[in-house]
Amino acid sequence: MLDMYVMVDGKKLRCGYTTGSCATAAAKAATIMLYNKEKLKTIDIDTPKGVRLHLDIEKINIGENYVECCIIKDGGDDPDATHGMEIWARAEKKDDGYTLKGGKGVGVVMGEGLYVAKGEPAINPVPRTMIESEVKSVLPKDRGVEITIFAPEGKKVAKKTFNPRLNIIGGISILGTSGIVMPMSEESLKQSVELEIRQKIANGHKDLILVFGNIGERKGMEMGLDQSKMVSISNYVGFALDCCRGNGVKDITLVGHIGKMCKIAAGCFNTHSRVADVRLEVLALELALMGYDIDLVKDVYNQKTTEGAVKFLGEGYDELYKRIAEKIAKRIEIYSYGEISPKILMFSMEKILFSE
């Protein structure tokens, strides 16, 4: 267990280590045991973060010309789908040189625009470098080794990750730019957003559909939007727009629930509740600007949620939602320096409020 902590919102949270670090440690340990003929209990590796990891070796299989061993992935206090997985490496003797392969449960990249070439195992560049460096540091002179990284539960676990959206088939990715999992980190989510945008562009899509998550994707499909153009952006509206602009995307459709959309209308481009919450303020202000009675404005403002406010208002407020959508579009145009032309699809849980 990694004894490293960070403070997030006043809470002490334990850090973990990436699948890339697990694969590196397993590969190094397997290589040592392959040529030294003795079992190890632990292994040390360096990480790009500058933290030296001391990891337990969970299981070992020894054959005539190969050794396999595994490290258990530990996500710390920010566990993802891969937390607790066995990440295995097989080291097999060869006459000379070093090669790296992906085995069972490690995905294969089937799309363009990712960090790894199409047809290659989904082992990202930093883990590839880490594995090669650590293995070569213990490989006897004039000896060779073939390393295969595999994860027996990878195919099942991958369904809970971004890999299906990124057209990575058959398993998980071996990831990590620092080797360390920082609790509550936005890095991995943002990286997935950027990768998905790049992949859509590489597949020939020049206009993209940005959704916040599964509900937005489903609503968009119900409205006839093309799923192959959809990018799930979580709360990172501004970051996604920056990625679109940086990759030459000129036209987007933003699909979202009125709660998150109201935040953008107010100029908030990170829609997480701990960053900003102006949902009811936007609705109340717009009603006031439209000249509605102050009692109605107060009633809307005092609702618990935007969903509740929409239900409270009932029918006959199409102009309200149109004005909010127009403000969202204007905010996006300003944010992107006029380089992105947006369309808006806004919904509540029960109905479409605005579509163009």
UniProtKB/Swiss-Prot annotation:
Q: Which EC main class describes this enzyme?
A: transferase
Enumerate the transmembrane spans.
Answer: none
Could you tell me which pathway this protein works in? Answer: Cofactor biosynthesis; adenosylcobalamin biosynthesis; cob(II)yrinate a,c-diamide from sirohydrochlorin (anaerobic route): step 6/10
Gene3D superfamilies per the UniProt record, alphabetical:
CbiD-like
Q: Which reaction does it catalyse?
A: Co-precorrin-5B + S-adenosyl-L-methionine = Co-precorrin-6A + S-adenosyl-L-homocysteine
As recorded in UniProt, coiled-coil segments are none
Keyword list (alphabetical) reads: Cobalamin biosynthesis, Methyltransferase, S-adenosyl-L-methionine, Transferase
UniProt entry tagged with the keyword Methyltransferase: yes
The molecular function terms of the Gene Ontology recorded here are:
cobalt-precorrin-5B C1-methyltransferase activity
InterPro entries in the record: CbiD, CbiD_sf
Gene Ontology annotations of biological process type: anaerobic cobalamin biosynthetic process; methylation
Q: Matching SUPFAM superfamilies, A to Z?
A: CbiD-like (SSF111342)
Q: Identify the EC number(s).
A: 2.1.1.195
**NCBIfam families for the chain:** cbiD
Which protein family is it in?
Belongs to the CbiD family.
Name of the protein this chain belongs to:
Cobalt-precorrin-5B C(1)-methyltransferase
